[in-house]
């Protein structure tokens, strides 16, 4: 199971102050990680499935400038942080 506190702490350490980060888990083991750019108020959402360990992003999220120029190059870092935060 993903330790939300640990994941948030590690993601914040890596991405603050560029993005504010929120994590929310549903009852199916899927956690939504929201990266909000305070300058533009745009939110980019990633999904992490604890059952398959897959990190996904919807095509409409990939089109956002904040993803293309702010997060895209860091997807491997994000996946590693999430995997390291599993218990």
Task: Identify the residue ranges that each predicted region occupies.
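Short, flexible coil/linker elements and helix-boundary hinge sites characteristic
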Residues: 15-16, 20, 35-37, 41, ...
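A short, structured beta-strand/loop element
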Residues: 32-51
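C-terminal basic regulatory modules in eukaryotic proteins
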Residues: 48-87
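N-terminal functional modules and adjacent low-complexity/disordered segments of proteins
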Residues: 30, 41-43, 77, 81
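Negatively charged, low-complexity tracts enriched in Asp/Glu with abundant Ser/Thr
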Residues: 1-32, 57-71
């Amino acid at each position: 199971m993903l330790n939300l506190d640990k994941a948030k702490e590690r993601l914040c350490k890596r991405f603050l102050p560029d993005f504010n980060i929120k994590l929310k888990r549903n009852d199916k083991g899927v956690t939504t990680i929201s990266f909000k750019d305070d300058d533009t108020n745009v939110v980019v959402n990633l999904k992490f499935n604890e059952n398959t360990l897959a990190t996904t992003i919807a095509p409409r999220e990939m089109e956002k400038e904040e993803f293309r120029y702010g997060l895209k190059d860091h997807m491997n870092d994000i996946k590693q942080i999430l995997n390291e935060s599993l218990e």
